Amino acid sequence: MFGLPPTRHLAWFAAALLALAPLQAGAASYRYDVVHSQILFSIDHDGYSHPFGLLHIARGWLRFDPHDWSGAATELDIDLAGVDMGDAGWNAAVCKRALLDCANHPYAHFASTRVERQDDHHGVLHGELTLRGITQEVSLPFTLNRAAMTIYGLHTVAGFSATAMLDRRRFGSTAFSGSIGQHVTVWLELEAIRDETSHSTSREQP
């Protein structure tokens, strides 16, 4: 084969495997699918109800190995100016300076610092959230739902569900304390596409 002696065949094959090993091992790079990723939040409204609002990820990246979470890391920007409360007037009110202050801080930013693995599908993501120009440490319990090739074979996707409880006062939002709750419950449904297929122009439909 290729005119090489048998011993050199083995040496050549071993060298090829060693060259491929770094490509096959370790955490892979992902980008968040901003279409299929959503952030839902809820806050008490004067004791009457807990209305919901919707936010979207503007951009973000993830480094992740489903088998070894030690090198996992992520950063993402959340579009605050696009908040959706289901009503244009309510959207504008939430964006005012007393609450989200979208004019001065149109994005929130999260950067992870470490991942605490609990089992094969559950963990806690620790990091720093910058909201309204104020940075605070937060922890998000999360579930790894699935990491696999999609049914259409177009992408390798990692999907997560996470939750958080935020005290808005820690981020300088203290207005309307008599009618709006202090604690905000947050749910995140995230899908991230592995970068090795990001060059594809094909898009999956829901």
Give the ranges of each region predicted by the language model.
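Low-complexity, acidic/polar, glycine-enriched regions of mature
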Residues: 25-206
